[in-house]
Amino acid sequence: MSKFKVIEIKEDARPRDFEAFQLRLASPEKIKSWSYGEVKKPETINYRTLKPERDGLFCAKIFGPIRDYECLCGKYKKMRFKGVKCEKCGVEVANSKVRRSRMGHIELVTPVAHIWYVNSLPSRIGTLLGVKMKDLERVLYYEAYIVENPGDAFYDNESTKKVEYCDVLNEEQYQNLMQRYENSGFKARMGGEVVRDLLANLDLVALLNQLKEEMGATNSEAKKKTIIKRLKVVENFLNSNLNANTDSDEAVPNRPEWMMITNLPVLPPDLRPLVALDGGKFAVSDVNDLYRRVINRNTRLKKLMELDAPEIIIRNEKRMLQEAVDALFDNGRRANAVKGANKRPLKSLSEIIKGKQGRFRQNLLGKRVDFSGRSVIVVGPKLRMDQCGLPKKMALELFKPHLLAKLEEKGYATTVKQAKKMIENKTNEVWECLEEVVKGHPVMLNRAPTLHKLSIQAFHPVLVEGKAIQLHPLVCAAFNADFDGDQMAVHVPLSQEAIAECKVLMLSSMNILLPASGKSVTVPSQDMVLGIYYLSLEKAGAKGSHKICTGIDEVMMALESKCLDIHASIQTMVDGRKITTTAGRLIIKSILPDFVPENSWNKVLKKKDIAALVDYVYKQGGLEITASFLDRLKNLGFEYATKAGISISIADIIVPNDKQKAIDEAKKQVREIQNSYNLGLITSGERYNKIIDIWKSTNNVLSKEMMKLVEKDKEGFNSIYMMADSGARGSAAQISQLAAMRGLMTKPDGSIIETPIISNFREGLNVLEYFISTHGARKGLADTALKTANAGYLTRKLIDVAQNVKITIEDCGTHEGVEINEITADSSIIETLEERILGRVLAEDVIDPITNSVLFAEGTLMDEEKAKILGESGIKSVNIRTPITCKAKKGICAKCYGINLGEGKLVKPGEAVGIISAQSIGEPGTQLTLRTFHSGGTASTDLQDRQVSAQKEGFIRFYNLKTYKNKEGKNIVANRRNAAVLLVEPKIKTPFKGVINIENIHEDVIVSIKDKKQEVKYILRKYDLAKPNELAGVSGSIDGKLYLPYQSGMQVEENESIVEVIKEGWNVPNRIPFASEILVEDGEPVVQNIKAGEKGTLKFYILKGDGLDRVKNVKKGDIVKEKGFFVVIADENDREAKRHYIPRESKIEFNDSEKIDDANTIIASAPKKERKVIAEWDAYNNTIIAEIDGVVSFEDIEAGYSADEQIDEATGKRSLVINEYLPSGVRPTLVIAGKGDKAVRYHLEPKTVIFVHDGDKIAQADILAKTPKAAAKSKDITGGLPRVSELFEARKPKNAAVIAEIDGVVRFDKPLRSKERIIIQAEDGTSAEYLIDKSKHIQVRDGEFIHAGEKLTDGVVSSHDVLKILGEKALHYYLISEIQQVYRGQGVVISDKHIEVIVSQMLRQVKVVDSGHTKFIEGDLVSRRKFREENERIIRMGGEPAIAEPVLLGVTRAAIGSDSVISAASFQETTKVLTEASIAGKFDYLEDLKENVILGRMIPVGTGLYGEQNLKLKEQE
């Protein structure tokens, strides 16, 4: 750290620039040196003369003259007397601006404490003296005494309890001790003076050493905590001058007694103004009232002391003075706030700076600016993409100075006055000059709320009549603007640099891509989509069908002469090839750039296709081509939307004819279910689920019917259908509400009402139906309002935590990365690998799994083409560089960040990626749902919720899977975890019979087979093998990884598969629940119909060892009998285009070497099995089965107490159902006593139905009980926005799950104090012990093997646990997949890198575990950078470095913990931050954006990053 010089800020000369900012405590001398005189009187101004009173709060003598260069009495008036002091009124002649900077002071008769250092936790004064805050307050407010000198005083007569230094005594104790020990040196006082003396007498160095000794001596955690608290404060004081320059007087560290105020500084009067309103009233700043109270009380105290008043009166006056000063600094912090005349609390100095209306956020971070205006916006369809229409009236005002200059320059006016008059009269010359001024001078348009950088864009103004700003239709999406009365603000950039930036970076035609996802944002919407869609449709039998035309000109002529319909299918020549197309599509082709291929335009263009087209043009052609193409597209869209004349009529809404029939059928089914419920055949929950299922499916059937009808209507030219189909407006769901039925509605509590709305909007709703539907509609509106506030707050927190992240260097040189694969949730893919890898840099070579050659080298930037190749290559996971693993000292390097999505190129140094990330995550926040879902107990009817089936071909492998056979002979899953069913294909087969051996060497795994004569070895990459915790489904994905079915030392037969590629995997319990029925055997083949997928020649192969041997004698109709059969499709160059594995029992449909097309089915499966079901289970219940044979006994299960008896009327069977609400301490349990002393216990959840009786004999795999899923599921799932902020805030969830910290075997120990004890024993002998509350539902069994990171109990996984147990990379995966699930679920695309930037900021601090020789204290949270710098310093000096562990901070805590004082203070908890910083004398090196904005310096991003090198703008010759 270089030493800094303190800049003295003089009145007339402001410093040009400064490099750092330090916050310190001011000494009384310092305060006096600032002051220009003492304020003695509480008066402000004289009400008759309106002149300030002498020595009052507005005194001109102290603070300076009211008018420029004029003394108060008027003796000296003029610039020439500058610096003269008037003899009569004592005022120095100066600029009146000095009243904003000159301070005064009040000399207090007695020292008072500064409330920030008393009341802000931890109380600094209290901590230093070792006194509790409450006691300290009693001393300061004259209610108790504090011992200054204990002498030989004792509390009791036996002299055992000694009175200590700084003990606090009440009146009685004090009188008692004074009588007995006054002569032996005992002394105690009360009030501010004694506290100041005690602080002044502190020897901080001695105290520091004493505390460090105590720290070493003690073992109790609580004591350590209090000592550390004091240590921190003491160290802060001692270190508060570390960076000051040694030769200045600033070098003295802060002294504790400076926390007490003897001289109270008085704010300059213009910062607490007093303004005369008309009617003789005054608007006055509250601070003046607070100062007046202080002065009044201080003067009164002075008088009383001169009069030698009784002690009690003086004491009271001193207490009142302390209270007055407290109110001035922070009104209402202690006791009741002082209220003004209008009964509202007065605004103290603290309140002026904090909060949204405070100085920081109101005036420093956001200011009102000159040269701006606002108006309503209207659409400007004739504008170019980079233009906006600016009303002439507005332009006249905005560009007035430019215009005046132009008028003078052209000689129309000789003086400014004359020019102004011309402008007022609006003469012709004025308009001529205005046109010239505006030409080439861009303006910025902003639409509030400014959620991301595209909310402010620059345009070239076009002067228009009227008063509304005209906006180009394509930029509406970026601004989120519509024309229903939105307003926008216009700003004029003034400096040449600003104008250049607007033209080069901010012009709307430059901002075509969204920085959040890299998708184009300027995509035609609504009318434009409809026009282009209409143009691209084809109509059978239209006029002029099947004609042949030579080109676009002929087509246009034919259209104009009405002998050809625009939708007619015609043939024509395009690029020298004959193609079949329509006239409309040729018109579209005529506006496309030449490089667009036929398959992009010769089809029906819907919104998605148009978006893809725009993206393609941008990727191939760049900005300018795209911008002009978009304009042509817009014009075409509007023109044909008008010509098409599409409109809605009630006749377009077609109700299905058999609607009534379907409804009656559904009602009949509902009645049947109701009857079986009344008979007691099904439970109430099942009845509800089934009824809702019926209505759901009825609604779906009707919707499908209706869509078919609408689609057929007018040969696909039904207006409503076109709107929905093209993606212009509306959706199938909305049409079905118009034409089929409105469907099921929800109750206010989120559950579904079982009677649906049968009517549709065309028929109209009846009163009840209308009433049911209003709740949902109104809730939607209320939600939106709340959502905006929440989303805005989240954005603010994100901005604050990420504002200092910028790209600082090209490459940090790290080889570290994070392994990524596709993100899935319950078998649905949320984000594919291709999407995740796009725009990232590889951290490791990517190996092609088929050829084993390097596909992409480390350091490759993955663009769209490369990502596509990777997606098709079958690679399932890659290692990429991320901001989290970046090793740059400050910020992030370009390689770890990857592509700047806003422009599609590698990011450049100086880019403020933190802000971009925060905006990208915050901006779509308003589109997320607000609510926490109650899954109102509806069991969905999806197949995936009751079975899993194979989508690919291969054969089955069981991993650790055990099964029971039940009475019906079915196989039932016996594992609760750590098992899986895998679908694999062979990669290596044994060439001969032998013994297998597997060994790990560095990065490789060597598999060898050996018999008496020979041995073969196969080398695999360790990275490619599926890890046990991946197979068990704890982390990562296994698709495409390798699986070794045999262990070392096993005997294997010839032609056995020993290394296999996993194609699909279903783990227990996430994909296959416990007690499911398994429908496949180990090793069984799974056959599917296989399509070729590529054109070419078929060649058949068989696997031998690890290579393929050609098999030629394969004919159509053969059935495959051998493992390891492959078919390869070779292209015309005889290269492998595609390879398929053919399982046993497949039927071959083509001969060897036959030529085929990509759509041909080359392998057929057995006719009866289309999809191979692997396992299935009860969709509505979680089943509990017996794991051993034995006898059942009940615990805590009693009819009428913890359970209800239900009698099935039809069958007369009795069953017990556990009550929903149980008395505390009651845990219904089933116990099975087996052979010997073996017993298994099952805890039952509420609503469980029991199928056995006490004392029954049962067999393994019998069903004991079922818990309805709806009951298990109705726990709230936090979703949407609350889930996102929960993750970013890193909140510890209320019902956090207990998580295993090591791999090992679970053992249950004796319960301890009503808690269950679980011990996990690892293989290496280590163990971990957990105490678990009885109320939690334990999910593991005695003797099970469990992986680190798995849940032991139910509940939510806490991010902190993931970090602690599985490390930073696992946390990275967890947070990204959880957050992406929310956003993707709402259809919002955000690139991972934005989330990574925020996560890297949440991990920017570490917790010191062992401080070594550093200046840190155990338990300190310090930023990684400070930690690294300090350790490097200690190592250079040869000391012990500190050791730290990573911690995860929520975004709020991370933002407040920023290294920059100003940035933290302007975010939240302003007073606390400033209190801490002032004591430590903290430095702010002004490295980030926020503090520079506040101080008005250039921000260090973009060219500002190189501010020191002084860049000059050069004109191009």
UniProtKB/Swiss-Prot annotation:
UniProt cross-references to Gene3D superfamilies, sorted A to Z: 1.10.132.30, 1.10.150.390, 1.10.1790.20, 1.10.40.90, 2.40.40.20, 2.40.50.100, RNA polymerase II, clamp domain, RNA polymerase Rpb1, domain 3
Cofactor(s) essential for the protein: Mg(2+); Zn(2+)
Sites where the protein binds Zn(2+) 1: 71, 73, 86, 89
UniProt-listed Enzyme Commission number(s): 2.7.7.6
Record keywords, A-Z: DNA-directed RNA polymerase, Magnesium, Metal-binding, Nucleotidyltransferase, Transcription, Transferase, Zinc
CDD domains: RNAP_beta'_C (cd02655), RNAP_beta'_N (cd01609)
Cofactor binding comment, as recorded: Binds 1 Mg(2+) ion per subunit. Binds 2 Zn(2+) ions per subunit.
Entry function: DNA-dependent RNA polymerase catalyzes the transcription of DNA into RNA using the four ribonucleoside triphosphates as substrates.
Name of the protein: DNA-directed RNA polymerase subunit beta'
